């Protein structure tokens, strides 16, 4: 008799656990279904805001046909920049960027979309003091150096050389892609 009671309690526990998991799964799926459109809309809003900050002269941003996640920044009917995604491997993993580049291949600015770099070191790559070095530079000048007297290239951040090189590599690749796409004009 004790054996039957133990088996019944095991089945009862299993049944209750299965029902609980099933109900939890339904609740999670319902919350995801309700919130995913809002999250997607918020992501688009963040990207649009970032593009406006990168190219504040633009009237509108149009998707570039044949290029995934590329946008042409338009002022009037003229393309004044391209906003291009880039990714590079930093000290803490992937660094995702949005890079604004002129049609003739000069960096306007960039924004770090996501990273896992060390706070206080690699995370400083998003600060104006580092980002400002990239302004108006073409691909050939996008090399990291540790010589403070060299203003032609990108000065590495102290304690974050790997991050400096990763961000510079990502920006350089974006510039090269735009230059290839436009023919440098």
From Swiss-Prot:
This protein's encoding gene: rnfG
InterPro entries: FMN-bd (IPR007329), Ion_transpt_RnfG/RsxG (IPR010209)
Requisite cofactors: FMN
Main location: membrane
Protein name (record): Proton-translocating ferredoxin:NAD(+) oxidoreductase complex subunit G
Keywords, alphabetical: Cell membrane, Electron transport, Flavoprotein, FMN, Membrane, NAD, Phosphoprotein, Translocase, Transmembrane, Transmembrane helix, Transport
Gene Ontology MF terms in the entry: electron transfer activity; FMN binding
Positions carrying FMN phosphoryl threonine: 161
E.C. no: 7.1.1.-
NCBIfam families to which the protein is assigned, alphabetical: rnfG (TIGR01947)
Top-level EC class: translocase
UniProt record similarity statement: Belongs to the RnfG family.
SMART domains according to UniProt: FMN_bind (SM00900)
Quaternary structure and partners: The complex is composed of six subunits: RnfA, RnfB, RnfC, RnfD, RnfE and RnfG.
GO CC annotation: plasma membrane
Gene Ontology terms describing biological process: electron transport chain
Membrane topology: Single-pass membrane protein
Its job: Part of a membrane-bound complex that couples electron transfer with translocation of ions across the membrane. Couples electron transfer from reduced ferredoxin to NAD(+) with translocation of H(+) out of the cell. Essential for energy conservation during autotrophic growth. Contributes to ATP synthesis during heterotrophic growth.
A Pfam family it matches: FMN_bind
Subcellular location(s) per record: Cell membrane
Transmembrane segments: 14-34
């Amino acid at each position: 008799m004790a054996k039957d009671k133990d088996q019944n309690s095991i089945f009862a526990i299993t049944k209750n656990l299965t029902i609980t998991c099933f109900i939890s799964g339904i609740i999670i799926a319902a919350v995801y279904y309700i919130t995913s459109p809002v999250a997607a809309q918020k992501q688009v809003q963040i990207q649009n805001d970032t593009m406006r900050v990168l190219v504040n002269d633009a009237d509108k941003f149009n998707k570039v046909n044949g290029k995934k996640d590329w946008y042409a920044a338009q002022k009037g009917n003229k393309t004044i920049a391209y906003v291009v995604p880039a990714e590079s491997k930093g000290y803490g993993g992937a660094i995702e960027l949005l890079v604004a580049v002129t049609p003739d291949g000069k960096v306007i600015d960039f924004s770090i979309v996501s990273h896992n770099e060390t706070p206080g070191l690699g995370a400083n790559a998003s600060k104006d003091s580092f980002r400002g070095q990239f302004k108006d530079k073409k691909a050939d000048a996008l090399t990291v150096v540790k010589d403070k007297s060299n203003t032609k290239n990108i000065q590495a951040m102290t304690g974050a050389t790997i991050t400096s090189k990763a961000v510079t590599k990502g920006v350089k690749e974006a510039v090269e892609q735009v230059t290839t796409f436009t023919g440098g004009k």
